[in-house]
């Protein structure tokens, strides 16, 4: 676990990255760390996904743009990734119509349960994690063809 000073320094360093260029904060890194508490849960999948889409949108895309397809299931998302699709899109209207936790069809007006989209994201992430476990146990490194 990092000390308070290490956390402050790490956050200050993070804020110097180009991703945060132009962002004005009326608070200091010290104030943020003070409010966090000593235990900071990590959201690894969210952090990895955010970093990947940031890199793609800022020049790492193979084609100079980022194409995407909608996926409603983990199987669809996994097949898209295997086919080379760089990003997966989860549509709110699709969740409203087909995958909300109330098991009913709704218009895309956020009338469905608020945890429906996070539940679909969790299922997609679980599929990706399982595929990663299978590849890793076979000796395949991330990014290998």
Describe the function of each predicted region.
Residues 60-63, 102-107:
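Glycine/charged-rich beta-loop-alpha catalytic/anionic-binding loops adjacent to active sites
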Residues 4-70, 81, 136-145:
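N-terminal amphipathic alpha-helix/helix-capping segment at the start of soluble metabolic enzymes
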Residues 72-94:
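Catalytic domains of carbohydrate-active enzymes, especially glycoside hydrolases
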């Amino acid at each position: 676990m990092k000390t308070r000073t290490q956390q402050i320094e790490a956050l200050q360093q993070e804020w110097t990255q180009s991703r945060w260029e132009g962002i004005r904060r009326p608070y200091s890194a010290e104030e943020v760390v003070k409010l966090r508490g000593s235990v900071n849960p990590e959201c690894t999948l969210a952090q990895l996904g955010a970093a990947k889409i940031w890199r793609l949108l800022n020049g790492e895309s193979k084609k100079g743009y980022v194409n995407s397809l909608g996926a409603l299931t983990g199987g669809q998302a996994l097949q898209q990734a295997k086919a080379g699709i760089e990003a997966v899109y989860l549509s709110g209207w699709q969740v409203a119509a087909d995958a909300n936790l109330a098991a009913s069809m709704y218009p895309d007006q956020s009338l469905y349960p608020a945890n429906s989209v996070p539940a679909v994201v969790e299922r997609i992430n679980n599929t990706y994690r399982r595929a990663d476990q299978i590849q890793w146990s076979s000796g395949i490194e991330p990014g290998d063809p």
